[in-house]
């Protein structure tokens, strides 16, 4: 019975993953961002209520990274060309400091990793201010929905299989 349930759950997740690829293609969004949101749904042991807080944490991180990018760009215009690496390190120091300081906010500590990952997501995706919504927000929502769907359908399937 254990192997049968595991196989059926695995097939279910495979089916959802294939559907995510199709939806990503149809909507012309980056599938890796969708999978990023989906994986983080599980990493943060989310439910629907927590998932919106996680999404907010992603966007706090994205916003901080956006401000950091503008600061790096500005400081590089006034600093000598030889100091670009040091300017970037200086700004990243402040970004990391701010992110960890967010732990003092009650009920936010568990979402600091999502905030960190939001900064990573921004820097890795190469999006601009104008493309954050279609290139990050929409795919993250799809990923969170895939995570919710996985847990919901897995729970229902487990109940059905164990009858």
Region spans (language model):
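N-terminal membrane topogenic signal
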Residues: 1-11
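Alpha-helical membrane segments and adjacent membrane-interface helices in multi-pass membrane proteins
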Residues: 33-73
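Structural signature of hydrophobic alpha-helical transmembrane segments
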Residues: 20-35, 78-93
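Pore- and pathway-forming membrane helices of multi-pass small-molecule/ion transporters and channels
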Residues: 28-45, 93-99, 103-128
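Membrane-interface helix caps and helix-loop-helix hairpins in membrane proteins
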Residues: 24, 75-82, 101-108, 129-134
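Loop-to-transmembrane alpha-helix initiation sites
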Residues: 85-90, 131-143
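Alpha-helical transmembrane segments and their cytosolic interface
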Residues: 82, 137-163
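Alpha-helical membrane-inserting segments
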Residues: 16-24, 64-76, 95-103, 121-125, ...
């Amino acid at each position: 019975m254990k192997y049968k349930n595991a196989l059926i759950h695995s097939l279910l997740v495979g089916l959802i993953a294939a559907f995510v690829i199709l939806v990503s293609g149809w909507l012309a969004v980056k599938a890796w961002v969708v999978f990023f949101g989906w994986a983080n749904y599980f990493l943060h042991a989310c439910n629907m209520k927590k998932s919106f807080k996680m999404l907010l944490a992603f966007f706090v991180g994205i916003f901080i990274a956006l401000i950091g990018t503008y600061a790096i760009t500005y400081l590089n215009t006034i600093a000598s060309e030889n100091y670009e690496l040091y300017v970037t390190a200086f700004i990243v120091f402040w970004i990391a400091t701010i992110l960890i300081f967010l732990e003092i906010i009650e009920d936010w500590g568990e979402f600091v990793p999502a905030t960190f990952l939001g900064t990573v997501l921004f820097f890795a995706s190469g999006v601009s201010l104008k493309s954050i919504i279609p290139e990050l927000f929409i795919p993250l929502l799809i990923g969170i929905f895939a995570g919710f769907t996985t847990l919901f359908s897995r729970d229902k399937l487990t109940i059905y299989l164990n009858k």
